[in-house]
């Protein structure tokens, strides 16, 4: 831990900075994998080590102008945690588990490369993709489906998007697209007092945070069963989905090529791999800012209350969560 504490301008300004590193040894994690014949999952053991690094900054200013006193405070911090060791017998390093070098909160997914267009296909009868256009393993894409970037050539060199085997050594075309843990946590405090009145305001927020949310509040007609589609509501803001000019007569040119969402389906919309994969395009912004508290108080002068045997009388009004900027889907 390294710190710096400064007082300046006649102690009106105070600056505190800290940088720290913390090592955690023997974290609980799934231990050595057991043979399949055992019929049980690996027991948790003290098999993982983690290193956390971060910093904190706090700046405070207080002064007075005549009988008016005021104060301003600001704090900012950030940190990350990384797995430095994980003892198990699985050389494959599953992305769903700890692995050395992993940063906690990693979100793995695919990088979107727009939508498939009718020009990506040889014709509209066979729906065969042209040479050089990446296909999707297990899926027959159509115009309006999400297209993904081929980040890694597979062993067959088929220019095909796949998930590999879900390990660090073979993640397919997945990569780290975000992090679910908050970064750049900040707070602001404002205060002032004058002739018995005292005002305090507290604000806080997170500068950066990613979230993957998949439900019918985020995606149009997102369903889990074909039989449920007629019961699915279409919420406000979800109508900007890809549309063809006239699919019934074979015109699959996009009416809105810059649509936010891919084409709709008459069956489960994860067909075509549109919503069944985590993608950078649809990560939600979970950063926020809120005015957490506003408190106004008044202290009655002692000369007014001493006649009734009171030493102090103070009244206040406090409001919680005055303003809030929420999750952006």
Predicted features, each with a name:
Residues 1-37, 70, 77, 81:
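Membrane-embedded beta-barrel scaffold of Gram-negative outer-membrane proteins
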Residues 9-12, 64-70, 83-87, 302-315:
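Short loop/turn motifs that connect adjacent beta-strands in outer-membrane beta-barrel proteins
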Residues 13-15, 70-72, 188, 194, ...:
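Transmembrane beta-strands of outer-membrane beta-barrel proteins
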Residues 16-65, 99, 103-111, 116, ...:
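Outer membrane beta-barrel strand-and-loop segments of large Gram-negative receptors
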Residues 19-25, 61-63, 76-82, 194-196, ...:
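Transmembrane beta-strands of outer-membrane beta-barrel pores
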Residues 64-178, 218-221, 227-256:
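Conserved small-residue
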Residues 206-314:
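Extracytoplasmic gating/loop element in the C-terminal half of outer-membrane beta-barrel translocons
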Residues 325-329:
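Conserved small/polar residues in nucleotide/adenosyl-binding loops
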